[in-house]
């Protein structure tokens, strides 16, 4: 697990968005699993390379709030739920119910509108979309922002579980205790550049 830390305006989100193809970088190269993918940087292309992003603004960038949990989760893999030109509702529901149970999303059913969920459960739906898409590397941009203490603990546990299963995780956070407790390695950014790098083990906040 890697963590990027810096104050607001440090350029962390901008770097990630340029890597994922949301915005265009002025320069630089992107490598994924040792292969250069600089020319393949649209969100759809990066998703096809099993690279996922959980954006900081989940309500605007991560979810369709007026859609159900079911439709949000199945969106990235809609082709897998389609037979010719017909959408398989059965496959959709099987997938979304599996993710609801796996991530302990608190909602009466997967037909519940995502906008009716708590912040923590909305975050879980965004993560579920990435898992459904078979993501291998995921960037979590302020994943616990605006969620309650209980949901934070669940998100931390989920991150640990995913990392133990082999998923690569880069978390962007401005909360120092979160960074130190959830990291293997920490990168500090300022003005769009990495200024320091630390191994998390044995690190103190003063350092």
Question: Residue spans of the language-model regions?
Answer:
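Glycine-rich phosphate-binding loops of nucleotide-dependent enzymes
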Residues: 1-207
């Amino acid at each position: 697990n890697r963590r990027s830390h810096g104050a607001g305006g440090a350029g962390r989100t901008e770097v990630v968005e340029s890597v994922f193809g949301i915005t265009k970088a002025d320069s630089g190269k992107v490598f994924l699993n040792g292969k250069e993918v600089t020319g393949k940087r649209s969100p759809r292309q990066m998703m096809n390379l099993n690279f996922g992003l959980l954006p900081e603004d989940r309500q605007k960038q991560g979810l369709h709030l007026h859609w159900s949990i079911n439709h949000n989760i199945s969106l990235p893999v809609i082709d897998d739920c389609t037979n010719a030109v017909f959408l398989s509702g059965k496959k959709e529901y099987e997938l979304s119910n599996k993710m609801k149970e796996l991530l302990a999303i608190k909602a009466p059913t997967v037909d519940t509108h995502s906008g009716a969920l708590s912040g923590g459960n909305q975050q879980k739906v965004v993560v579920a979309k990435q898992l459904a898409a078979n993501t291998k590397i995921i960037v979590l941009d302020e994943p616990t922002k605006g969620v309650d203490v209980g949901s934070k603990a669940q998100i931390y546990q989920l991150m640990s579980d995913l990392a133990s299963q082999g998923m690569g995780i880069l978390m962007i956070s401005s909360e120092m205790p979160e960074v130190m407790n959830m990291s293997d390695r920490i990168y500090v950014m300022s003005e769009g550049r990495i200024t320091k790098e630390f191994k998390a083990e044995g690190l103190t906040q003063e350092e």
